[in-house]
Amino acid sequence: MIDRETSGRALQQIPYGLYIVGSLNGGVPATIVANWVTQVSFSPPWVAIAVEAGSRMKEYIAASGFFSVNILPSGGRDMAKAFLKGPEAEGGTIGGKKFEGAKNGTPFLAGASASFECRVVQALDAPDHRIFIGEVVDAVVRREGKDVLTLRETGWRYKK
């Protein structure tokens, strides 16, 4: 059996970005902060995200069939902090931040360096997360070539 403390420290060495993942709760945009996001295919372009098993977001994504990923720029800690409690849309903003609806309504945040919307093509359960794989169906780039916000930059930790 592997030592969980040692394996946890080893896994913390993976460079994790911080992203705002969005979906729709009965047509209302909702968001969470996520850091387990990766591209898994070039053609077609597919992305995988992991959502905590206890998060309502996994139900929103499953019901709507879509999710968005908003890539935050380096220095965007305060922006990420606004989404830690998983806010929903209110008067054209989420967590006080402006957004626009993507092709299928998921939120694209105005302050993100880039945003993309995915149609769910597969989902599977890991022991403590639900993994969604989605095909990119809409995208916008606002600031190309900028460094992205990382978990390490914020000083935050994500562990159980």
Predicted regions and their residues:
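Basic, polyanion-binding surface patches
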Residues: 1-160
